[in-house]
Amino acid sequence: MDTQAITIDEYNNDGSFINLYMNESIGEWCAYGFSAYGLLLFCKSNGYNALQSFSKGMQMPCLIITKEVLMQLLQNTTDITEQTDSHIGIRMPEKITMDAYRGWVKTLKGKLPEVYKM
């Protein structure tokens, strides 16, 4: 994974996008920062499981989904902005709520251990 590209993408994300990255070391798709929260909302509203944590290496929240959840996301999405073997960009119908995002990050930092080095 290109950590610099992830950092830049999330810096430029105004809360309207989900950027997903293939993490080759675990073989699953990951989202960071605002993207992770947007993806969490999608997973919760559709009853999908996801692993959530705070990445110490990236200094951002992280969400990991399986390929099956990714396929469901892509089937329910009409605005895919980019799709390669290692990165998928999706425009969400609505921006995330910043207060809710900050509360989620606080929760992750406070109680969830870092499961994988990301």
Model-derived features with residue positions:
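Basic, polar low-complexity surface loops/patches
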Residues: 1-118
